[in-house]
Regions:
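N-terminal maturation segment of proteins
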Residues: 1-188
Length: 188
């Protein structure tokens, strides 16, 4: 919260940009994933050449599915690596970029490939923790926001993207507190 206040105090015009839906230039999902894969190499261990496919959710399922998801491949083949994008979801280019960082590189796809290459004991495939898996991908979104700032020509681009990320983080904290309050403490 203090970081957001500090950024806005130094540059109050960023609030107008947030409200005016200032955005990244439009990019194709495949181009975003290629860029993310390249940028990931600076911050995380390299992966072997990884094949992946981007597909779109069928019209009949668009109403019921999330904005995007990574389809985990079978254990014995580790392929195919598929990311589905829901085209019915209205999102900004920045949201698409960070969603693909969550689902692709350095998110779920990266995590799955990296884990598989460690040749873990078979028991580790049987015991999974969705908290660990989603925790990693949510943590990774901060990198997605950092990487996205490289695509803004605006002088305030990195501050704008940082402020957007901080806003998302604050919202996730609020959701968590409400979830605990409602389901543990019985708030109504």
């Amino acid at each position: 919260m203090n970081n957001a206040q500090k950024i806005l105090k130094q540059n109050p015009s960023l609030l107008r940009k947030l409200n005016s839906h200032f955005d990244l230039p439009e990019m194709e999902p495949q181009d975003i994933l290629t860029a993310l894969c390249q940028k990931t190499g600076k911050d995380f261990p390299a992966l072997p050449e990884t094949d992946y496919t981007v597909r779109y959710v069928h019209r009949s399922m668009q109403e019921y599915l999330s904005p995007a998801f990574y389809l985990t491949p079978p254990l014995d083949t580790r392929t195919p690596n598929i990311i589905y994008i829901n085209p019915s979801d209205q999102r900004s280019n920045l949201e698409l970029f960070t969603t693909l960082s969550h689902e692709g590189f350095p998110g779920h796809l990266y995590q799955t490939i990296f884990f598989g290459n460690t040749e873990p004991s078979d028991i580790r495939y049987l015991i999974t923790s969705s908290g660990y898996i989603e925790g990693w991908a949510t943590y990774i979104e901060s990198y997605g926001y950092q990487y996205a700032s490289n695509y803004l020509d605006d002088n305030d681009g990195s501050d704008y993207v940082c402020l957007t990320w901080l806003n998302r983080s604050i919202n996730l904290c609020i959701y968590s507190l409400l979830d605990i309050g409602i389901h543990y403490y019985g708030w109504s």
